[in-house]
Swiss-Prot record:
Pathway: Pyrimidine metabolism; dUMP biosynthesis; dUMP from dCTP (dUTP route): step 2/2. This is Deoxyuridine 5'-triphosphate nucleotidohydrolase. GO terms for biological process: dUMP biosynthetic process; dUTP catabolic process. It comes from Rickettsia rickettsii (strain Sheila Smith). Belongs to the dUTPase family.
Amino acid sequence: MTITQVKIKKLENFSGSLPEYATEHSAGMDLIAANEQPITIKAAAIQLIPTGIAIALPDSFEAQIRPRSGLAVKHGITVANSPGTIDADYRGEIKVILINLGKEDFIIEKGMRIAQMIIAKYERILWEESISLMETMRGSGGFGSTGV
């Protein structure tokens, strides 16, 4: 396995520990809330939650912000734009857009694990316009065409 080093900066509001893998085979690292005061996410509402970190990803890498399954299943708290994308040239604070799909208000406390961050390599492409596309068995079937 290749290990890529990524620079990370602790901002003034940083609290707790840097994102880290929970197990040897974890794909994502937990992000920690760095809000000074508790933030209430009302039912059906969205809040932007600070993490207190900024990163410098290498070219051809992105960070994906995804929900934590425990928050989603127990409280209906998920990432509104999942997966959120942090581009390699972004140097500002990583913030997480959380939405409360539950029926009750939910309070985000400083130090709470709020989301997962996955670092992924990607390729850029160039479009090649074409009059036709190669046929496949699936064709243009979509939105449930391969079964439920």
